[in-house]
A protein has these predicted regions:
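Short conserved active-site loop signatures built around small residues
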Residues: 1-7
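Positively charged, small/polar-rich N-terminal and surface patches that mediate targeting and assembly
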Residues: 2, 13, 39, 199, ...
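Acidic-histidine catalytic/liganding microenvironments
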Residues: 51, 252-256, 304
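Conserved C-terminal alpha-helix-loop-beta "cap" of PLP-dependent enzymes
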Residues: 258-346, 350
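A common structural junction motif
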Residues: 216-217, 304-312, 365-369
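Conserved N-terminal alpha-helix of the aminotransferase class I/II PLP-enzyme fold
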Residues: 14-68, 90-97
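PLP-dependent enzyme catalytic core of the Aspartate aminotransferase-like
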Residues: 96-97, 105-106, 119, 237, ...
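Conserved PLP-enzyme active-site core in the AAT-like
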Residues: 56-257, 262
Length: 369
């Protein structure tokens, strides 16, 4: 068989009672239960670790469960965590609504303001958590510089690398300690399965693995198999996504109905040089403000015909969304304002369709303004 084997099993048979005891005690290698390990899932984990340059990777049921595992494994009641303001809405909810219940203190410095990160540190700061590029504004942080600050303060740096994937950025090589992925997005690449990944060094990963085996947000073997298929085309897909996204961003920047385009590949982007330095491509996500506020943004979205109105991204199909009322809709207006997410903002995750067809669909949106 040329493809990887798919092991759809919950448990494993042992040769003898002594064999079972030895495996459960960790005295001999081998699978004991698919909540712990599964051959298909293990293959996926090993390939992600190789791509990210990590000592170990562990797969989870979703990107959010990867963040849950990271924080619950490495932080305790009384610890302090710094999270960038520019993160996914559910990530903010997880920190604000749930982690704080366990006595974990959380503050939100601006992503790219290194001085603010250093000033926000406390003696009990345990973890820095960032998305770079961020969702949905494609804001960046100098990962190497932020890692130096975190380590000087005795903290770890975790980077959500979902938008770039290891095909375009490898945060561990820039000094980060842990990398997070929603494998649901570009690792899958076709909107088929849901999963997450935590990758890092041995001492941190031992704690994460222990939590996941106990708590059980386990990746299904079938989804791991889908992700293995996705990894085979990851680099070429990310190159194609990036090329089309840059061309679309440049085109949108010239349109009179657009106030501002957020895409680090643009020469006009204030962090363009940083993106060139720490990424090998600019990714697929292009966000922009239209003139006219929420009503205009909704008219633009509703006028499109080819793209899919959905908050998921990473698909071969282009998706379009209104962050203020969907992915970040649970945030307060004040929190959205601090994150730079206004009512006129539209996020487009550029797929692999013909670029001229995509521009024609965006032109329909512009005509509705």
């Amino acid at each position: 068989e040329h493809g990887e084997a798919l092991f759809t099993t919950s448990s494993y048979v042992f040769r003898t009672a002594a064999d079972a005891a030895a495996r459960f005690a960790g005295e001999v290698p081998g699978n004991v239960y698919s909540r712990y390990t599964n051959p298909t899932v293990r293959t996926f984990e090993e390939r992600i670790a190789a791509l990210e340059g990590a000592e170990q990777a562990v797969a989870t049921a979703s990107g959010m469960s990867a963040i849950l595992a990271l924080v619950m494994s490495l932080c305790s009641s009384g610890d302090h965590v710094l999270v960038s303001r520019s993160v996914f809405g559910s990530t903010i909810s997880l920190f604000d609504k749930y982690f704080k219940r366990f006595g974990i203190q959380v503050d939100y410095p601006p992503l790219s303001d290194l001085a603010a990160w250093e000033a926000a540190c406390k003696p009990n700061t345990k973890l820095f958590f960032v998305e770079s590029p961020s969702n949905p504004l494609a804001e960046l942080v100098d990962i190497a510089a932020l890692a130096e600050i975190a380590h000087a303060k005795g903290a770890l740096l975790a980077v959500d690398n979902c938008f770039c994937t290891p095909a375009l950025q490898q945060p561990l090589k820039l000094g980060a300690d842990v990398v997070i992925h929603s494998a649901t997005k570009y690792i899958d690449g076709q909107g088929r399965g849901m999963g997450g990944v935590v990758a890092g060094r041995g001492e941190q990963m031992k704690e994460v693995v222990g939590f996941l085996r106990t708590a059980g947000p386990t990746l299904s073997p079938f989804n791991a198999w889908l992700f293995l298929k996705g990894l085979e085309t990851l680099r070429i897909r990310m190159q194609a996504h990036s090329a089309s996204a840059l061309a679309l961003a440049e085109w949108l920047e010239r349109q009179p109905g657009i106030e501002r385009v957020y895409y680090a590949g643009l020469q006009s982007h204030p962090q363009h040089e940083l993106a060139r330095r720490q990424q090998s491509g600019f990714g697929a996500v292009v966000s922009f403000d239209v003139k006219g506020g929420r009503d205009a943004a909704w008219r633009f979205i509703d006028a499109t015909r080819m793209v899919s109105i959905t908050t998921n991204l990473g698909d071969t199909k282009t998706t379009i969304a209104h962050p203020a009322t969907t992915s970040h809709g649970r945030l307060s207006p004040e929190d959205r304002a601090r994150a730079g997410i206004g009512d006129s903002l539209i996020r487009v995750a550029v797929g692999l369709e013909d670029l001229d067809d995509l521009k024609a669909d965006m032109a329909r949106g512009l005509a509705a303004l």
